[in-house]
From Swiss-Prot:
<dbReference type="GO" id="GO:0006616">
    <property type="term" value="P:SRP-dependent cotranslational protein targeting to membrane, translocation"/>
</dbReference>
<feature type="topological domain" description="Cytoplasmic">
    <location>
        <begin position="2"/>
        <end position="30"/>
    </location>
</feature>
<feature type="compositionally biased region" description="Polar residues">
    <location>
        <begin position="353"/>
        <end position="362"/>
    </location>
</feature>
<dbReference type="InterPro" id="IPR016447">
    <property type="entry name" value="Translocation_assoc_membrane"/>
</dbReference>
<keyword id="KW-0256">Endoplasmic reticulum</keyword>
<protein>
    <recommendedName>
        <fullName>Translocating chain-associated membrane protein 1-like 1</fullName>
    </recommendedName>
</protein>
<dbReference type="GO" id="GO:0045048">
    <property type="term" value="P:protein insertion into ER membrane"/>
</dbReference>
<keyword id="KW-1133">Transmembrane helix</keyword>
<feature type="transmembrane region" description="Helical">
    <location>
        <begin position="249"/>
        <end position="269"/>
    </location>
</feature>
<dbReference type="Pfam" id="PF03798">
    <property type="entry name" value="TRAM_LAG1_CLN8"/>
</dbReference>
<comment type="function">
    <text>Stimulatory or required for the translocation of secretory proteins across the ER membrane.</text>
</comment>
<comment type="similarity">
    <text>Belongs to the TRAM family.</text>
</comment>
<keyword id="KW-0811">Translocation</keyword>
<feature type="region of interest" description="Disordered">
    <location>
        <begin position="325"/>
        <end position="373"/>
    </location>
</feature>
<feature type="topological domain" description="Lumenal">
    <location>
        <begin position="142"/>
        <end position="158"/>
    </location>
</feature>
<feature type="topological domain" description="Cytoplasmic">
    <location>
        <begin position="239"/>
        <end position="248"/>
    </location>
</feature>
<feature type="transmembrane region" description="Helical">
    <location>
        <begin position="81"/>
        <end position="101"/>
    </location>
</feature>
Length: 373
């Protein structure tokens, strides 16, 4: 994310700079078109498809005579709903940036490198915190903690409550909104491949859980993963404000490893044992049943490969830091390299994302001046 420089000159209409500076207003007008469409009978049917959740069904509650529950399933019309809430995510992104993060940046006087990373961590920490609270409330209300067998019991989980469907729609909308944000935030070309991989992994796993009717397992894994990621980005925010705050990274490193282990355990229990012992193991697209051996192996393989990739990046990052800090040096050079080591360790803290060093780890203008002096 680059720094958006405010100039006194108004850029030409429909130019790149004009769109970047006013993208929140443009998107707000587009979202208002859908909301205004609800007011007119001619356009109401089309507007409802974008604004409200689709595929609502009423099912009688088991064991309770005369009581019915309103549940949802997924379909092609969900793409329209995801598009509308993607617009909402772009607007909220701009609001957080302008009214919270930009004000903090002006007070802290960050370098260009720290500025972009502070914005990234600020946006993601807000999203992860909101998603954790929302997802945890669904888990508690549906009793997934007290009854973990429900993660695979009764599969396929074709129908799910309003809150769970809205949660998945919001997750997809947020990660799809990250694509245009690469343009709006003037992301550096060398950072785009890393961001595309990061966004693509989220969309791949969320869409997989949503389409394969593994929504319960996906919800639990997302909350677990988001909690660990929230700790990392909060630790990085505190580190940017004061470089003495480094204990948060130690806590994050421990929880990162535990999070990977818990993810693998839950996936093996649910997919490898729970679904493998289910009676209905035939592919039935009409009923949303994907419980066959090939799909189970594919699900486990994709999750295991992703977790192994994250751990490999994490271990390499930690080993690199450990070698740099523990490498023996002559006593005559220790005093000369003390300040250089401090700067290197600070860069590692700033550039780390999920245990990896990001590609925009170049020296900031401020640090260059210190070195030349």
């Amino acid at each position: 994310m680059g720094i958006r420089k405010k100039s006194s000159k108004t850029p030409p209409v429909l130019s790149h700079e004009f769109i970047i500076q006013n993208h929140a207003d443009i998107v707000s007008c587009l979202a208002m078109v859908f909301l205004l469409g609800l007011m007119f009978e001619i356009t109401a049917k089309a507007a409802v498809m974008f604004v409200t959740l689709q595929y609502n069904v009423t099912i009688p509650v088991e064991g309770v005579l005369g009581e019915q529950a309103s549940l949802y399933h997924y379909g092609i019309k969900d793409m329209a709903t995801v598009f509308f809430y993607m617009l909402v995510a772009i607007i909220l992104h701009a609001v957080i940036q302008e009214y919270i993060l930009d004000k903090i940046n002006r007070r802290m006087h960050f370098s260009k490198t720290k500025h972009s990373k502070f914005n990234e961590s600020g946006q993601l920490s807000a999203f992860y915190l909101f998603s954790c609270i929302w997802g945890a409330s669904i888990i508690v209300s549906e009793n997934y903690f007290s009854d973990p067998i429900s993660l695979w019991k009764g599969y396929p989980h074709t129908y799910f409550p309003f809150q769970m469907k809205f949660f998945y729609i919001s997750q997809l909308a947020y990660w799809f909104h990250a694509f245009p944000e690469l343009y709006f935030q003037k992301t550096k070309k060398e950072d785009i491949p890393r961001q595309l991989v990061y966004i693509g992994l989220y969309l791949f796993h969320i869409l997989g859980a949503y389409v394969l009717n593994l929504n319960r397992l996906g919800l639990v894994l997302l909350v677990l993963h988001y909690f660990v990621e929230f700790l990392f980005h909060m630790s990085r925010l505190f580190y940017f404000s004061n470089e003495k705050y480094q204990k948060g990274f130690t806590v994050w490193a421990l929880l990162f490893v535990l999070g990977r282990l818990l993810t693998l355990i839950l996936c093996v229990l649910t997919v490898g044992f729970g679904l493998a012992r289910a009676e209905n193991q035939e592919l039935d697209l009409s009923n949303g049943n994907f419980n066959i051996l090939a799909i189970r192996i594919s699900v486990l393989a994709s999750i295991c490969i992703t977790q192994a990739f994250m751990m490999w990046k994490f271990i390499n990052f930690q080993l690199r830091r450990w070698r740099e800090h523990s490498s023996p040096q002559p006593s005559s050079q220790r005093k000369k390299t003390t300040s250089a080591k401090g700067k290197a360790s600070r860069k590692e803290k700033e550039n780390g994302v999920n245990g990896t060093v990001t590609s925009n780890g170049a020296d900031s203008p401020r640090s260059r001046k210190e070195k030349h002096s």
